[in-house]
């Protein structure tokens, strides 16, 4: 056995001997998170993100704290970024696998599954060949609830197969980092479950070496797409769907039925999380989603009722908006719902404090 083979064998064996801490006498990585750090420092991670730590292109944008667009209160909006373009990042263990093809396929399936749930899902590119720059991909998520960049990972060690959700840095001036980590954990747990990887998935962060936005604080994202999304105030994750340098994972990702299954499960994760978030922050009767009950809300209810009575087929922007309009919870929109909204509005205008019910309270009562 030559020296390289001996080292590779030793590293492969150590991956599955994972004590909670690294002993002083053993400098090899022991956990998936330590392995990610090790691979990056040794420059043997074969994934290419397009020289992400250079060419920051948001100079013309104002700072996110001053310009972030608020998501639509009525509609869940997800921006999906299919990683790379053309026939890029081939597997070194299975002929015919290209990361760019997998990400394009999975992203389109995910878009379909989200739309079936009533979510507005959009892509950062229009074809397999389309290859927008990295930060502008993130910028496209302005006003969306979430940005998801779809990838598979690569390394020189073929035994590694854990999924990785790359999340935002810990930030004390916003809560989008909390959303990034929360959704990242849900996604990596789901990908681990669906792909049945041998190693449990992790959430991970990579800090830029530079002050990319020029605010004097070294707290920026290394990954260009995440840097761009964070800059416009959108929580996001770069999701590595295991490693295409692992034989079993690569074969799994080449099966169309598996990608469809994965898309369905990830769509359910995203829909459930953001539907719950919107419900927990929405009053019943607040049809327009502006945070209060008003005459305008009652007018929207009456307009819907009148169109329905005239034999038309009125619609709201989402089922969440319909739920807020159904004030009495009888699964229909009537004049009574509008009257209840007006009564609540009148009490508030008179300085009283009527009881307001959140959509989430009704959903879980």
Language model features with spans:
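Sec-exported extracytoplasmic/periplasmic mature domains
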Residues: 108-119, 142-146, 152, 188-197, ...
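Cellulosome-associated attachment modules in secreted, modular CAZymes
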Residues: 22-27, 279-365
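Surface-exposed patches in mature extracellular/periplasmic domains of secreted proteins
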Residues: 119-129, 150, 195-207, 277-280, ...
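Extracytoplasmic/secreted envelope proteins and their assembly/folding machinery
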Residues: 104-107, 111, 138, 144, ...
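Active-site-adjacent substrate-binding region
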Residues: 180-221
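Sec-dependent N-terminal signal peptides of Gram-positive bacterial secreted proteins and lipoproteins
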Residues: 2-25
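Active-site-adjacent mobile loop/cap segments within catalytic or ligand-binding domains
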Residues: 79, 88, 149-156, 204-280
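Catalytic-core regions of hydrolytic enzymes
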Residues: 42-183
